[in-house]
């Protein structure tokens, strides 16, 4: 069962993988823009409740962390304009190589459900 899931997700990553704009990957640029705007932050959750938005711990911006099964993420705080929070998910042992981007509407729980790594960011148009 696990092998089939990983194989399917690998195919999904291969099909949706795309290069990110260099400014998104630049930690200093993105962090300074986020600080100036102050329009939300990404939350990494276990047992995320979509009704209350409750969650176990907050993930810092532009930080590479390993995540396990049934880990959820959401965007909360000052994001009442309907903008999405996005996370980049890498396949492998760190935030390098092939990746895909997943986005989640503000204050909504979105299930990643993978054993891959994540590095969070918020798009700054």
From Swiss-Prot:
It is found in: Secreted. Disulfide bonds join 45-55, 48-109, 64-95, 86-103, 104-110. Residues 20-37 form a propeptide. Thermostable. InterPro entries: G_crystallin-like (IPR011024), Yeast-kill-tox (IPR015290), Yeast_kill_tox_sf (IPR038651). Stable over a wide pH range. SUPFAM superfamilies: gamma-Crystallin-like (SSF49695). It holds the Pfam family Yeast-kill-tox. Its main location: secreted. Residues 1-19 form the signal peptide. Keywords: Cleavage on pair of basic residues, Disulfide bond, Secreted, Signal, Toxin. The keyword Protein transport does not apply. One of its GO terms (molecular function) is toxin activity. This toxin kills sensitive strains of yeast. It inhibits beta-1,3-glucan synthesis. This is Killer toxin HM-1.
């Amino acid at each position: 069962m696990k092998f089939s899931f990983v194989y399917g997700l690998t195919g999904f990553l291969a099909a949706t993988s795309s290069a990110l704009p260099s400014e998104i990957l630049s930690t200093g640029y993105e962090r300074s823009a986020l600080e100036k705007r102050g329009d939300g932050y990404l939350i990494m959750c276990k047992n995320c409740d979509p009704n209350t938005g409750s969650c176990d711990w907050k993930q810092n911006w532009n930080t590479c962390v390993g995540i396990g099964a049934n880990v959820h993420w959401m965007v909360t705080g000052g994001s009442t304009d309907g903008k999405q929070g996005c996370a980049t998910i890498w396949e492998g042992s760190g935030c390098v190589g092939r990746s895909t981007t997943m986005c989640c509407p503000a204050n909504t729980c979105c299930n990643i459900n993978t054993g891959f790594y994540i590095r969070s960011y918020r798009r700054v148009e």
